[in-house]
Amino acid sequence: MEEILRDSRNAVEKYHDPSPYSMNMVALAPCSPFSASEELYRQSAILARDLGVRLHTRLCETLDEENYVLTKYGKRPLAYMESMNWIGNDVWYAHGIHFQDEELRLLAETGTGVAHCPISNMKLSSGICRIPDMLKLGVPVGLAVDGSASNDGSNLLEELRVAFLLHRLNSSITNIK
């Protein structure tokens, strides 16, 4: 873990450009609650805030992840992350499919963001992220492509198109008169 944190610090110090609209911003991003230790998450949060960079990880992507965190830590994934100070306007989570209502309100209240990856979520049958609900509550939402293992092209314009069509279809179900 010390090597990861040292390398992270070095990467931020060497490459991070905090100026507005910079295309060279570094974030600290342990992969997911089932592949990174609790201590790495805690120390990453401390380091990121010390260096003034953002935090990113996957969260609430699958029901398997939710069950893993509940079993191992006795908490829902967002409560687990909050216990390690992974909440706030410097944090964003990829996916966010399985957040409950009260968790969406917490995300909105704290300015914690969600990166929507609809193509990956469709390919893996993970579920549909509640983007319309998030936007109504004021959760910061971005659009992203996932890694190459679950996204065939890393095409952000295609991701935009699919997000539009997916949520148009999904919202039409509740708007039938």
Language-model features: locations:
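Short, acidic/turn-prone active-site loops that include or flank metal/cofactor-
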Residues: 61, 118-122, 147-149
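Domain-wide signal for the mature, well-folded portions of proteins, strongly enriched
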Residues: 5-18, 26, 110, 127-129, ...
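His/Asp/Glu-enriched, well-ordered alpha-helical/loop segment
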Residues: 83-90, 132-177
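Histidine/acidic-residue-rich catalytic or RNA/ligand-binding cores of hydrolases
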Residues: 63-75, 103-108, 125-134, 151-168
